[in-house]
Structure formats: structure tokens, C-alpha cells
């Protein structure tokens, strides 16, 4: 046990944690040079392209330290993005230590801080590492000071390295071995294993990545998953040295995989506890699960519809397959008058939503229409009952509503001093309430309470463009508060198009209605009859635009001649147009739904 070290790497996006992981694997000889490739642990093509880590991965490596002993080190790679913070907390609770990787040229950023506090809260030993010191603009002294100011851990001893060139990586491992304690736990106790991650493999079913806290696990053992009580027979256990290697047993302190012929991922939830089933000789089930398991609740909802209605079944299958790998994704079928059959999907945040959409389009070749993302509102009806509304079309009539509560989140923003003014303006424009403001070296930390609905649309993009990409943020849910929000409906020729409805704050509902209507006028193609586009709040029309009809010049064949002849032709045309307008329906192009997402303030 004394020679085992479990650690993960915490870093902001692009501070080089995947590259550092590659170097550590290379140094320990986990893969031969031929098998080595950049970002070995990021196995999804989207992960590679965007340079982000989404799913947690592991590598069990052997390292011969300077003191001559061979250490068994388990590296657990974690995502850095705030949307995936649950995955991070699971990975961290499986470790005794974490390397805090900070880019020496950029200093500390928001998500590093969020994940680092999470690590300190879980009692994990944090070892600061300064990366990218080969860059000419690297300033390690300033970065050390920032770590001390912002996070409050001693960084005077921080190891410097360059993951790209491999400089100083051995020192990082030595420091980690010296400072991180070995795992506690007893191989003789009843089995308790934490599921860090689980994914679906087409050949063997669900693969669970577990950290054995107490006890031992061997093939042919019967195991029980404590959250839902289902039992399964273990077929294989082993470790990843990034490649999977079968082992005869996994014992306390180790991290490895378990394959037990589980058919669906919903059974093996991340954060659940695995133990032995009762009634086996010499195997005692654990009396209680490990702490910290919670169901992940989606924060952002959007409708996904296939462009071709015939692809509905295919979309359902793709979502099922995707859910096998992404337990945080929720979906349920819904019907829209404008878009036909589709699904209402729940996501952890905006990045998660983009990635799900991209994976559906890329891995499963779907063509999708996405409706505007919304958050969950709590509506207290006049009858006294409270309902949750995650879809504008489910919002009851205004007369039946007492109060509407909207989710408020606490947002921490970090940015260089020169951008503070413009970021504050942005937050105030989004109905933010400033809670706190700290100067930390050259960085500023702003804390705001903002309605989640304002963040969902375009807050992130705006924040990045105002600050030229230097500002970073993380948010967490605080509470529900009463809010004066209204539903804006878009009517086309007097008919409501449910997929275009949005819920917005009353103060900017009129302007929002006007903008959407103006945008729709440019997008909806001209028909043979006039098309009226209106924005309505309840029964009040707040904006209207017309798309003029295309018309044939019916007088072309009359040269000169009597006015009554011309009038007859014009009247006849007018009658025809009127009749068309009664029966005609307007095709709403795909862009119209996207336009709603990009309405500028």
C-alpha cells in the first residue's frame, strides 16, 4: 500500500494538463514510443479538436523513484470545464493528491480555482506545478504569487516544468511522490469501491472505472451496486496503462476497471458504491455506501428536432447510445406544432449542450434543429400548486399564475484589471447584482448573482469577446427567486409558432419581441400572399412586421385601353391572394430557429 500513489491533474482549459499527462506516461513507459500520440488520454475526436477533456480517463504506471523503490502511480485525468464539475469531483474523491497545473505565462484562471477549492474541500493534497516555462513570456514568480493570493496555498516550492519539451517532468513526479500520502484502506475489510466513471463498450457492455477503497475484488465475485441494488457477476478486472491490461485482482487503494456484463449505463451511475452481494463465502457486503453520491441535475434545457421527420427514430437511437456514455444527459419526447416530433433534452450547461449536439451530428450523422435553450422556472399557480416549467409552451396562462421563480446563480469572474469596467457593464445589463470584488495581484475577482436565464443565451460569448478571451468564469446554483418574467410568443399569420416562444424578463420583453420579429422578416421567404409576423405578450401585440407578397404584373397584357378592364384584373388578383392567404401555410426555414439564439441586445 505504501508504494501506491493516486493523483489527478487540475488545470484550466489549455494550461497543458493533457500534455503533462502524456509526458508522465512516456516517462514511466506506459506506452512504447510507437503507440504514443498527442493527448493520449483524450480519446474522443471532439476532445482533441477543441483541446478539452470531457470524460475522465486513467493510467496505472510504474515509476522507479530516486530512492530506488518502484512506485505504482495512478493518474486520473479530469475535465477542466465547469460544466463537467461533477466528473471532476468524482475523480478527485478517488485520489489522495492533485497536481495543480498553472500556465506560467497566464497565471491562475477561474476554473482552476473552482476545481482547486473542490480538491481542498475533499481533503486532497494539492501540489502546485508551473507549466510552459519554456515560453518567452513565462513569468513564474508572478504565477507563484497569484497561486498564493488567489488560492492561498504555499507555492514557494512549486515545481517548474515544460510539458511540451519534457523539461522537469521527473521532478514533478518526485515532488508528487514526496508530498502525496499513500491511500488509506484495508484489503481485509468488506468491499467498497467508488465508480469514478463508466462507459459503454459494444463488445463487453458497461465498463466501470473504480477506485477500491476497502477490500479486494476478483473475477467471478458477485457484486451489488448500492444506489439501485442490482447484482452482477464480475467477468474481468484490470487496469489501464492507458491500454487495458487484465489483472487477477484489484485490492484496496488501486484504481482499475470492472466488467460485469451490465447492459445499460443507467445501472452503473458515476459516484455509486460497488460492494459484494450477500451470501458468498468469505465475502461480507459493506454496511453503507461511500459518501458523496448525488444525482446530476441538468440546468439547461433545449428541444432537439430532426430536420427530416422520418429521422425521428434514428435520433432516438442516437440519444440512447449517447446516454450510454453520458449519464448526465436527460431526454424525453415532445411534440411541437411547427417542428413535429422531437426531444426535450436537459444538459449540464452550454458547453455540454454544444458537445452533445456536435456528437450527434458527427458520430451519428444527424441533421438537427435546436430551439432556444431555457432554464427551469418554478411557477406558483393561483390554485397554490407549484410546477416546474422547462419549456415555454408549458407555461400556464398569465391569469392562472401567482408568481414565477427563476434560478439565480452565483458567478465568479476572473479577469485582468483593464477589462473590469466593461465586464461590470455586461453584468449589470444582464440584471446582475454585485456581491464582491477583490484585487488579487494583476487579476480581479468579481462575484455576481445573475439569473441563469441570462447566462444561458450568450453571456459566455460576450464575456470572452469583451475581454479578448482573458476573462474566465465559473458558476454554481444558488436559489430560486421571484422574477417578473413573461412569455413572448411569435405569431405568423395569426398562428402561434410554439418553437419560437421565449421566456424573458418584462423589462426587455418588448425590445426582444421587436428584434425577433425584425429578424424573422429577413429570414422568412416571400410568399404569394402577405405574411404578418407579430410578437405577442399574452394577448397584447407588441411588434409587427410584414413580408410583402410576390405578385405577377397582371396588367402586362393590357396596352392602354379602359381603366375598368385593368381594375377587373387587379380585383381578381386581390381575391385570389386573399383566398391563398386563408389556406396557405408558411414554411419556416431552419435559420429562423437559429436566429432566435443570436438576437443581439
Swiss-Prot record:
Recorded family membership: Belongs to the TRAFAC class translation factor GTPase superfamily. Classic translation factor GTPase family. LepA subfamily.
Full protein name: Elongation factor 4
Organism from which the protein derives: Polynucleobacter necessarius subsp. necessarius (strain STIR1)
One term of GO molecular function: ribosome binding
Function: Required for accurate and efficient protein synthesis under certain stress conditions. May act as a fidelity factor of the translation reaction, by catalyzing a one-codon backward translocation of tRNAs on improperly translocated ribosomes. Back-translocation proceeds from a post-translocation (POST) complex to a pre-translocation (PRE) complex, thus giving elongation factor G a second chance to translocate the tRNAs correctly. Binds to ribosomes in a GTP-dependent manner.
Taxonomy of the source species: Bacteria, Pseudomonadati, Pseudomonadota, Betaproteobacteria, Burkholderiales
Name of the gene encoding the protein in the UniProt record: lepA
Alphabetized Gene3D superfamilies for the sequence: 3.30.70.240, Elongation factor 4, C-terminal domain, Elongation Factor G (Translational Gtpase), domain 3, P-loop containing nucleotide triphosphate hydrolases, Translation factors
Record domain tr-type G: where: 2-184
Subcellular location: Cell inner membrane
Amino acid at each position: 500500500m505504501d508504494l501506491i500513489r493516486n493523483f489527478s491533474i487540475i488545470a484550466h482549459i489549455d494550461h497543458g494538463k493533457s500534455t503533462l499527462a502524456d509526458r508522465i506516461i512516456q516517462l514511466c513507459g506506459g506506452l512504447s514510443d510507437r503507440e504514443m500520440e498527442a493527448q493520449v488520454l483524450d480519446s474522443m475526436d471532439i476532445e482533441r479538436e477543441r483541446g478539452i477533456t470531457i470524460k475522465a480517463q486513467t493510467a496505472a504506471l510504474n515509476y522507479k523513484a530516486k530512492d530506488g523503490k518502484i512506485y505504482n502511480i495512478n493518474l486520473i485525468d479530469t475535465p477542466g470545464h465547469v460544466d463537467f464539475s461533477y466528473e471532476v469531483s468524482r475523480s478527485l474523491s478517488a485520489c489522495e493528491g492533485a497536481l495543480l497545473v498553472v500556465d506560467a505565462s497566464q497565471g491562475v484562471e477561474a476554473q482552476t480555482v473552482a476545481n482547486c477549492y473542490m480538491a481542498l474541500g475533499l481533503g486532497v493534497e494539492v501540489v502546485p506545478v508551473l507549466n510552459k516555462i519554456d515560453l518567452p513570456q513565462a513569468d513564474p514568480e508572478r504565477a507563484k504569487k497569484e497561486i498564493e493570493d488567489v488560492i492561498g496555498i504555499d507555492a514557494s516550492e512549486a515545481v517548474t516544468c515544460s510539458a511540451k519539451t519534457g523539461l522537469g517532468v521527473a521532478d514533478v513526479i518526485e515532488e508528487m511522490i514526496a508530498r502525496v500520502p499513500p491511500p488509506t484502506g484495508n484489503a481485509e475489510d468488506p468491499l467498497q469501491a467508488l465508480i469514478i466513471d463508466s462507459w459503454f463498450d459494444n463488445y463487453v457492455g458497461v465498463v466501470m472505472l473504480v477506485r477500491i477503497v476497502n477490500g479486494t475484488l476478483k473475477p467471478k465475485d458477485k457484486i451489488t451496486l448500492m444506489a439501485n441494488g442490482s447484482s452482477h457477476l464480475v467477468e474481468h478486472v484490470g487496469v489501464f496503462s492507458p491500454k487495458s491490461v487484465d489483472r487477477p485482482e484489484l485490492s484496496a487503494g488501486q484504481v482499475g476497471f470492472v466488467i460485469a456484463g451490465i447492459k445499460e449505463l443507467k445501472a452503473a451511475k458515476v459516484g455509486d458504491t460497488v460492494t459484494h452481494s450477500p451470501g458468498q463465502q468469505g465475502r461480507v457486503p459493506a454496511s453503507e455506501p461511500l459518501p458523496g453520491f448525488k444525482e446530476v441535475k441538468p440546468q439547461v434545457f433545449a428541444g432537439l428536432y430532426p430536420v427530416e421527420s422520418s429521422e425521428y427514430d434514428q435520433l432516438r437511437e442516437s440519444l440512447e447510445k449517447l446516454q450510454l456514455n453520458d449519464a448526465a444527459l436527460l431526454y424525453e419526447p415532445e411534440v411541437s406544432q411547427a417542428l413535429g416530433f422531437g426531444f426535450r433534452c436537459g444538459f449540464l450547461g452550454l458547453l455540454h449542450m454544444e458537445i452533445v449536439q456536435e456528437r450527434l451530428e458527427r458520430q451519428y450523422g444527424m441533421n438537427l434543429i435546436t430551439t432556444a435553450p431555457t432554464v427551469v422556472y418554478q411557477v406558483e399557480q393561483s390554485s397554490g400548486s407549484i410546477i416546474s416549467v422547462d419549456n415555454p409552451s408549458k407555461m400556464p396562462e398569465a391569469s392562472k399564475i401567482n408568481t414565477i421563480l427563476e434560478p439565480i446563480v452565483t458567478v465568479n469572474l476572473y479577469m485582468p484589471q483593464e477589462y473590469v469596467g466593461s465586464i461590470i457593464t455586461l453584468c449589470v445589463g444582464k440584471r446582475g447584482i454585485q456581491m464582491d470584488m477583490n484585487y488579487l495581484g494583476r487579476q480581479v475577482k468579481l462575484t455576481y448573482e445573475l439569473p441563469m436565464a441570462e447566462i444561458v443565451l450568450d453571456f459566455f460569448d460576450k464575456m470572452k469577446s469583451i475581454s479578448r478571451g482573458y476573462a474566465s468564469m465559473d458558476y454554481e446554483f444558488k436559489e430560486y427567486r421571484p422574477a417578473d418574467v413573461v412569455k413572448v410568443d411569435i405569431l405568423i399569420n395569426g398562428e402561434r409558432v410554439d418553437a419560437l416562444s421565449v421566456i424573458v424578463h418584462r423589462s426587455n420583453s418588448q425590445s426582444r419581441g421587436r428584434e425577433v420579429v425584425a429578424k424573422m422578416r429577413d429570414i422568412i421567404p416571400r410568399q404569394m400572399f402577405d405574411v404578418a409576423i407579430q410578437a405577442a405578450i399574452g394577448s397584447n401585440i407588441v411588434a409587427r412586421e410584414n413580408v410583402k407578397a410576390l405578385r405577377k404584373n397582371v396588367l402586362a397584357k393590357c396596352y392602354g385601353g379602359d381603366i375598368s378592364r385593368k381594375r377587373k384584373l387587379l380585383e381578381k388578383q386581390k381575391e385570389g391572394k386573399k383566398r391563398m392567404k386563408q389556406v396557405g401555410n408558411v414554411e419556416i426555414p431552419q435559420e429562423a430557429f437559429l436566429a432566435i439564439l443570436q438576437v443581439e441586445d
